[in-house]
Amino acid sequence: MGDALIRDAAVLRDIAPADAAICAGLARAVGWPHRPEDWEMAIGLGRGVVATLGEEVVATALWWPYGEHHATLGMIIVSPEHQGAGIGRQLMQAVLAQAEGRSLLLNATVAGQPLYEKLGFVVCGAIRQYHGEVTAVPVPVLAGGAALRPAGLADLPVLEQLDQAATGLPRGPLLRAVLEAGEGTVLMRGGEAAGFALLRRFGRGLVIGPVVAADLTDAQTLLAHGLQGRQGQFVRADIEDGSPLGAMLTAAGLKPVDSVNSMVRGSLPRPSGPFKRYTLASQALG
């Protein structure tokens, strides 16, 4: 079937939780490690579309609203057999219509970036993925009277405040979902929360993120604490390309792998600071 016939035959519909297992298989076909559980979380937090040919799901695209003015896009996949037929553009146009009126953020694969540029996205940064088995566990250094304690659901209001100060986005549902799926740590200083890190199962092992802190030292402390007891386990972290955290992750046994360009269509969110997001929840969710 020619590209035009494939494009015309593709039927788009809203993605549903029941699609999670099928989407995980599609992700594996393009080398992505996402489990059905990872898809269930992503679908539950956002909206999106799938493209079908007959009964077969051949492409996906999702988006996640953060407040009234911004959203992130991700999980944009076209099966290898149907790439180049224009289905990716159809999907993107569908999610752009769903998210109309919002400024949009995404992390672009090399293959996807030309399409996103044609749709009005511009590069605004880069993210580097580190992953691997932990071989050396760094010791957390508690500076300036800091202390660490476990995070619970009762901490969500303050975690949301720190996260919004770091990202400029209200991401309460995301933080709740990540904490419910895993565990977290709060860095305390002077009786107040001064940073946090969340960790959950994802893909081939564990992912540490988001990590939010006021400075690099506190971020390193939270990251080191998250690696405690993880020797021999597969861990992933997504950080800004060129971040000093890369040296720490490499020393722990994680290796730098692919990088992606961060892109925006519209206006960037405006973090109020002084907090900063040092690792992502995922490249799709931000």
Language-model-detected regions and their locations in the chain:
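Basic, Lys/Arg-rich alpha-helical nucleic-acid-recognition elements, primarily the DNA-binding modules
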Residues: 14, 28-44, 51, 56-86, ...
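Conserved catalytic-core motifs of GNAT/GCN5-like acyltransferases
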Residues: 103-107, 122-136, 256-268
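Intrinsically disordered, low-complexity, positively biased terminal segments
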Residues: 1-6, 16-17, 21, 41, ...
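Conserved active-site tyrosine of GNAT-family acetyltransferases
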Residues: 116-121, 249
